[in-house]
Amino acid sequence: MEPLENPFPEPVEIEITDSFDLHSFSPKDIRAVVEAYLAEAHKKGFATVRIIHGKGVGIQREIVRNVLSETDFVRSFKNAPEFSGSWGATIAILDV
């Protein structure tokens, strides 16, 4: 009998930059992914990050902004400028 394929693939490592695109994530994963991203971005010393959630119906934007409002080291957040995603992305200012 052949061994079963591992149902848990190896984790994917993503380089942490000051911009993070959530388009490839399911809404059910957004909270955990954004929390992990913010922790790593803060650890790296980023003062500002851009989280791209898309325009859509606003489900991902709402989740992102809830996480931001609950995160102690987030000073403030707002829509990205028009040239950088507008209301399809959120800019967060972090304590450094």
Predicted regions and their residues:
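Long, charged, low-complexity intrinsically disordered regions
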Residues: 1-96
